[in-house]
Amino acid sequence: MPRTPHLLAIQSHVVFGHAGNAAAVFPMQRIGINVWPLNTVQFSNHTQYGQWTGQVLPPEQIPALVDGIAGIGELGNCDAVLSGYLGSAAQGRAILDVVARIKQANPRALYLCDPVMGHPEKGCIVAPEVSDFLLEEAAAVADYLCPNQLELDSFCDRQPNSLADCVEMARSLLARGPRAILVKHLNYPGKAGDTFEMLLVAADQAWHLQRPLLAFPRQPVGVGDLASGLFLSRLLLGDDLRNAFEFAGAAVHEVLLETQACGSYELELVRAQDRIAHPRVRFDAVRL
């Protein structure tokens, strides 16, 4: 029987709704990943509601929790680390220390950094120190970097005028160290208004994926967290870059279809769980 991959997911959590680990953990489990959730913050709900309560995990607690895992002899079984929303730059540095420790225990372990700075329609949602940390430190350590358009623009200190510019910008990030760049949400002049577009760029390949853009009164939160988690999960399950990319795009679309059908603001992960595991429609990525 094939071994089930293990993934340490270090990002935010909400008690109500779906964002961060609350958006990513169940879908990753549903497709066959043993997930170890480590929550950088625990909030009552995601911040787009405009009010919330909760706490940020003290940075020193991150290595302390990993010490506990090492103490029971399981650290070498970790196949990947995923990091997302950070409450502080100190948390980020603690995560990079954890990544180094896990890679020492398992040299084949992967690190995917979802560099959460904001969303193009919402503006920057993290402290400036976190953005600086992501730009200057995390990108150099990540095997996979998964920015949205705003975050890609911040990394490259420019805005694109075309899809070709987006490819060039993503490719420039490869020089910092990542194996591949997944741009979870493209936005550039001339982009078709009725499509949602994603981009995957590695040293020897670039893939562009389009799917229908679904309309919502308020855009659901957690879509990027879901996409990053599914992409990394499919890589751990043996997919190549293109297939992991196409699977993530299709599974996220299934969740959004169910969310739209229910008239929900929060992602309908439970109702869509079978279609997350087995998307009904795949969108072919086009090689650029």
From Swiss-Prot:
ATP binds at residues 114, 151, 184, 211-214. It catalyses: pyridoxal + ATP = pyridoxal 5'-phosphate + ADP + H(+). GO terms for molecular function: ATP binding; magnesium ion binding; pyridoxal kinase activity. GO terms for cellular component: cytosol. Its cofactor is Mg(2+). The keyword Kinase applies. Keywords: ATP-binding, Kinase, Magnesium, Nucleotide-binding, Transferase. Substrate binds at residues 12, 47-48, 225. Pfam families: Phos_pyr_kin (PF08543). Pathway: Cofactor metabolism; pyridoxal 5'-phosphate salvage; pyridoxal 5'-phosphate from pyridoxal: step 1/1. It is an enzyme of class 2 (transferase). The keyword RNA-binding does not apply. Homodimer. Belongs to the pyridoxine kinase family. PdxY subfamily. Pyridoxal kinase involved in the salvage pathway of pyridoxal 5'-phosphate (PLP). Catalyzes the phosphorylation of pyridoxal to PLP. HAMAP family: PdxY. This is Pyridoxal kinase PdxY. It comes from Pseudomonas aeruginosa (strain UCBPP-PA14).
